[in-house]
Amino acid sequence: MGSSFGKLFRISTFGESHGGGVGVIVDGCPPRLKLDLEAIQADLDRRRPGQSRITTPRKEADQVEILSGLLDGVTLGTPIAMVVRNKDQRPQDYKDMEVAFRPSHADATYQVKYGIQARSGGGRASARETIGRVAAGAIARQLLKQANGTEVIAWVKQIHDLEASVDPSSVTPEQVEGNIVRCPDAGMAEQMIQRIEAIGQEGDSCGGVIECVVRKASTGLGMPVFDKLEADLAKAVMSLPATKGFEIGSGFAGTLLKGSAHNDAFLPTQDGTLHTATNYSGGIQGGISNGEPILIRVAFKPTATIRKEQQTINAAGEATTLSAKGRHDPCVLPRAVPMVEAMVSLVLADHLLRQQGQCSLW
């Protein structure tokens, strides 16, 4: 339970970090969608470990195998199964963690809930679970692009206390991929890289914020009350490992404004589409997209598994210390960028199909 997401465009992920592999089944993808298989692999390459000096040194090719649902690269409308085999496991690095709970990790809560857990590699709590999400999200992104020209672009907005200045209206994927931290602000990116390296050398970790914009989103996506678009986006990105906060549009800063300043005034347009003078709403009003860019921010905590010695307890509840071995990211944000893009794309693809099914018959 808890490994499936979506209603019409639905995914189910499977696998553990140190098991045979991880993957996903995508159910509900429309037929006759021509897929760029290299684009799926490209997104997985952006997520994979060992890609730079500021990520975990674990070496995985993360080569995706597509087992079903396609004919000559075109979707059949049947379930699409994708798997990535694990190659570079080192379970010996987790010996100490078999008897001591990692502070702020899922070790203790998984043990309390299930009475058993895959300690090696973190099991389902490992970020390797997100491989399936990124692969499925790459399909969703292609569906959105082909259907409406929709673009989903995320980037690192903040690392520790270093915040970048980025214009969401003009940022490009090339700017995001222009450096290893995936921050379009080149000057700030270098400072971020230095900060991550310095904190990592201390045996510690740091967190930050990822920002994501959706351009050319369809108008009318989202449902009233419980299935509001921003609510589903929040659930989607907050289901990613290490997430601790979500904002849309003006977010918490909007609480400092008066209504007269915060309201997005509607402007007349020649084609009759909705357009606003400002976008404090973040592209969503009443839980439904209004056609303006959707802008969200996601906060990620510092990586829980660190080399610095920490106080903890063992499975018997006895006090002990833990200095985690293994290969872990000093900061998850550079690799989390494609994860955020994937989850946003999955939500939008699901709501696009729901919108078409409910409101496009006549």
Curated annotation (Swiss-Prot):
Its EC number is 4.2.3.5. Belongs to the chorismate synthase family. The keyword Oxidoreductase does not apply. Homotetramer. Pathway: Metabolic intermediate biosynthesis; chorismate biosynthesis; chorismate from D-erythrose 4-phosphate and phosphoenolpyruvate: step 7/7. The keyword GTP-binding does not apply. FMN binds at residues 124-126, 286, 301-305, 327. This reaction introduces a second double bond into the aromatic ring system. GO terms for molecular function: chorismate synthase activity; FMN binding. The gene is aroC. Reduced FMN (FMNH(2)). This is Chorismate synthase. It catalyses: 5-O-(1-carboxyvinyl)-3-phosphoshikimate = chorismate + phosphate. GO terms for biological process: amino acid biosynthetic process; aromatic amino acid family biosynthetic process; chorismate biosynthetic process. NADP(+) binds at residues 47, 53. HAMAP family: Chorismate_synth (MF_00300). CDD domains: Chorismate_synthase. One of its GO terms (cellular component) is cytosol. Its cofactor is FMNH2. Keywords: Amino-acid biosynthesis, Aromatic amino acid biosynthesis, FAD, Flavoprotein, FMN, Lyase, NADP.
